[in-house]
Amino acid sequence: MAMYSLFRSVRSEVVKGCLTQHVQSLFTSCPSLAADKALLLQLRKSTGYTFVNCKKALEKCNNDITQAESWLHEQAKKEGWSKATKLEGRKAKEGLIGLMMHDNAAVMVEVNCETDFVARNEKFQQLVKDVALSVMAHQSTSKKTGFIKSVLSSEDMSKLNAPDGPSLADQLALTIGRLGENIAMRRAVSLSVPSDWHIGSYIHGTVAGQVGIEMGRYGSLVVFQGEPKEGTYALGRKLAQHVMGEAPVSLGNMDDLSCGDSETRLLPQTFLPDPKYTVAQYLTLQDARVLDFIRFQCGESSSQE
């Protein structure tokens, strides 16, 4: 009996000691656990990747957040290229037109995806902005003067550098990996005009979200010359709205006679903002003339591709 009591006493002390050590261990390990959690939250916020992948990155990089972020981007790029290859045959007819103006220059791009849901995603819209910025930067390196119009294909754009360093092709693959849809940089046009020329622009079906760029389902640019009575901005916007609504396919001449509703030449068409006049008549009133125009509709077939 005495032996049994002694055994119970010893056992109680052992259990108490183990519990004390366990509690002390928990308290001493809490600071490091908190630090890991803080790093995890920081990495998740800065990259947008899943908690699982962020945790894996921190473990692989010994909690070095800079290395972990680089590792995540590299893995995402690899996975994006792999996914892009698998998805490239799928139809991508949704997306956005991006339009950017700067001084006497303008850029309009079309980036396609599979669904309207992805087109409204912030990461997709950031890609559209990056493509427009890259095309604008590429255009600014030209040493040509006067009126410059450049049409870029998907292949042309893939060779450009993205604003933050990597190629646009890598940026595209990264976005495909994140969003899981086929995405394509379809086409772009850049314009640069002399100081006495002007560019009018219009975006229809506007989508808000990014600063410094207009986005929507349709976009138009009009190059014109003159000092209109109503001001260059007002006339430029009206002309671009007309091009958007009437979809002309050629410019025509100032003295062309209209063929009515079936007219596809810009100048003889009835002027959409003021139907009392043809486009040519309205330009004459404003002492201006149109030199060129471009119209993009998201998902349309195009001879410019």
From Swiss-Prot:
Main location: mitochondrion
UniProt KW keywords: Elongation factor, Mitochondrion, Protein biosynthesis
Alphabetical GO biological process terms: mitochondrial translational elongation
Annotated PROSITE patterns: EF_TS_2
Gene Ontology CC: one annotated term: mitochondrion
Glycoprotein listed as a keyword: no
Spans through the membrane: none
Keyword Lipid metabolism appears in the UniProt entry: no
A Pfam family per the record: EF-Ts_N
GO molecular function: translation elongation factor activity
Top-level taxon of the source organism: Eukaryota
Subcellular location: Mitochondrion
Disulfide bonds: none
Record family assignment: Belongs to the EF-Ts family.
UniProt function note: Associates with the EF-Tu.GDP complex and induces the exchange of GDP to GTP. It remains bound to the aminoacyl-tRNA.EF-Tu.GTP complex up to the GTP hydrolysis stage on the ribosome.
Further information: This protein may be expected to contain an N-terminal transit peptide but none has been predicted.
Protein name, per record: Elongation factor Ts, mitochondrial
